[in-house]
């Protein structure tokens, strides 16, 4: 089983990218579990047809310790298994701790057992803050492979660089590696070239450039992935291509994060900060 975590700054399109990629992989016959590690609990919505899933933390709060796997795991599009860790009540507690609690519970309940015959476990992780809890999938070796969703916008690249620093910190102990950058385009000038250059400086690859298309929003309004909503659309093929590239990817690196001056120079060289 490959354990993959998707990181990236808030609002960059991590959950959308993850769910569409998972839909592409499940079309290829892969068995996948998606674990949402974001207090918003929107990491599985499109796979479940908009069904608001009861989170692990809510279930624990309401049921106590007496929880079955089916209480916290739902079956979504093409047989994908969907779980949301959820978060604490606003203003109380630490969302990062919630992720730790959730993943530990899933392990205890046998969600990762060989009998489940999983090909992939995907963690969709809130990514601006590489605080202890959110870094947990990396730190504890729960995920071995990281993909960072990025765009040509300054804050997205800044967050990606920070996440890379987190990977370096835990790479030696946990064996975690960076698999590549996924560029979720915002139609910034010279975006593709800039992210390719950024990836090269980090020592990794831009595994795929996902063009911006309103079909993504249209599918989301209909509570579906693009692959389910309009399978013949060119955007569905983009996600299928990304899924195939991830499935075939053997590049795993410990990244070399940039100094802030280098990052700013990159932005200036490609015209965004001019």
Swiss-Prot record:
Residues bearing the modification ADP-ribosylarginine: 97
Catalytic function, reaction form: N2 + 8 reduced [2Fe-2S]-[ferredoxin] + 16 ATP + 16 H2O = H2 + 8 oxidized [2Fe-2S]-[ferredoxin] + 2 NH4(+) + 16 ADP + 16 phosphate + 6 H(+)
Name the UniProt record assigns to this protein: Nitrogenase iron protein
Positions annotated to bind [4Fe-4S] cluster: 94, 131
Pfam families: Fer4_NifH (PF00142)
Lineage top rank: taxon: Bacteria
GO biological process per UniProt: nitrogen fixation
Any one Gene Ontology molecular-function term assigned to this protein's record: ATP binding
PTM summary: The reversible ADP-ribosylation of Arg-97 inactivates the nitrogenase reductase and regulates nitrogenase activity.
Keyword Magnesium part of the UniProt annotation: no
Sites where the protein binds ATP: 8-15
UniProtKB keywords: 4Fe-4S, ADP-ribosylation, ATP-binding, Iron, Iron-sulfur, Metal-binding, Nitrogen fixation, Nucleotide-binding, Oxidoreductase
Free-text remark on how the cofactor is bound: Binds 1 [4Fe-4S] cluster per dimer.
Needed co-factor(s): [4Fe-4S] cluster
CDD domains from the UniProt entry: NifH
E.C. designation(s): 1.18.6.1
Assembly mode: Homodimer.
Entry annotated with the keyword Metal-binding: yes
């Amino acid at each position: 089983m490959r354990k993959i975590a998707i990181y990236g700054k808030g609002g960059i399109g991590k959950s959308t990218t993850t769910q569409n990629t998972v839909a592409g992989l499940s079309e290829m016959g892969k068995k996948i579990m998606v674990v949402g590690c974001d207090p918003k609990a929107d990491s599985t919505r499109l796979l479940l047809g908009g069904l608001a899933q009861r989170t692990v933390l809510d279930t624990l709060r309401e049921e106590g310790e007496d929880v079955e796997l089916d209480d916290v795991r739902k079956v979504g599009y093409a047989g994908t298994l969907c779980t949301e860790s959820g978060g604490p009540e606003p203003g109380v507690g630490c969302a990062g701790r919630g992720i730790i609690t959730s993943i530990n519970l899933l392990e205890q309940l046998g969600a990762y057992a060989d009998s489940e015959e999983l090909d992939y476990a995907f963690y969709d992780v809130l990514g601006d803050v590489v605080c202890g809890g959110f870094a947990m999938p990396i730190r504890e070796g729960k995920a071995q492979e990281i993909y960072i969703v990025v765009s040509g916008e300054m804050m997205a690249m800044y967050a990606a660089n920070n996440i890379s620093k987190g990977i370096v910190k835990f790479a030696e102990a946990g064996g975690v590696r960076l698999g590549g950058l996924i560029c979720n385009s915002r139609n910034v000038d010279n975006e593709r070239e800039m992210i390719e250059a950024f990836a090269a400086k980090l020592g990794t690859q831009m595994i795929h450039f996902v063009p911006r298309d309103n079909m993504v929003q249209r599918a989301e309004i209909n509570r579906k992935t693009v692959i389910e909503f309009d399978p013949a659309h060119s955007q569905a093929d983009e996600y299928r291509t990304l899924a195939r590239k991830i499935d075939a990817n053997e590049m795993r690196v410990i990244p070399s994060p940039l100094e802030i001056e280098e990052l700013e120079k990159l932005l200036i060289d490609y015209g965004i900060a001019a």
